[in-house]
Design a protein with these regions (language model features):
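Acidic/His metal-coordination segments adjacent to aromatic residues that form catalytic metal sites
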Residues: 4-7, 45, 83-97, 129-137
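Short, contiguous alpha-helical
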Residues: 35-81, 110, 124-163
Length: 163
């Protein structure tokens, strides 16, 4: 259990460091760079940040609810995340608002991860009839998901600057 808690403390610290670093680098980017889509099927930087806000809000519910119950049945939005981004119109939102919401939501998640009740780490989210994920795995994987999308944003910004 001690190893898992140390791992999660490291995850929380990395989330905070990544968020602060990215927010500092991206705060002053112009809208034409932020709305650039490398192809018609790709998201812009604004849309990726919007998706990460959706991810944070869904994971916030999971992280808290899984400390209240041993097994959680909660919908997975993954199959609909393109629609989530479209419905919320992230492409046309003010950048300062998106970046701020993303930053603060992740600071909140890092704090939840850091202070999780160790006795709840094996509580499970029931994805479907056959698949479950523990709270520990959800929290640890959140960092990987964040890193993947920050890499996506880095590539999108490079393409926008080369365009």
């Amino acid at each position: 259990m001690h190893q898992k808690m140390n791992k999660l403390k490291s995850v929380a610290q990395k989330i905070e460091q990544m968020i602060e670093s990215a927010a500092d680098r991206w705060r002053a980017l112009p809208d034409n760079i932020l709305t650039f889509r490398p192809s018609e099927n790709d998201w812009s930087t604004k849309e990726v940040i919007g998706h990460l806000i959706d991810s944070a809000s869904n994971n916030h519910q999971r992280f808290v609810r899984l400390q209240l119950t041993q097994q959680l049945i909660f919908p997975d939005y993954g199959q609909d995340n393109i629609r989530w981004v479209s419905i919320q119109n992230y492409q046309n939102r003010r950048w300062e608002e998106l970046l701020g919401l993303w930053r603060y939501y992740n600071i909140q998640l890092a704090d939840i991860i850091r202070s999780v009740d160790p006795s709840c780490l094996n509580h499970v989210w029931q994805l479907d009839a056959n698949d479950t994920v523990t709270l520990f795995d959800l929290m640890a994987d959140y960092l990987r998901h964040l890193e993947d999308h920050l890499d996506q944003i880095t590539a999108t910004l490079a393409a926008a600057n080369a365009h």
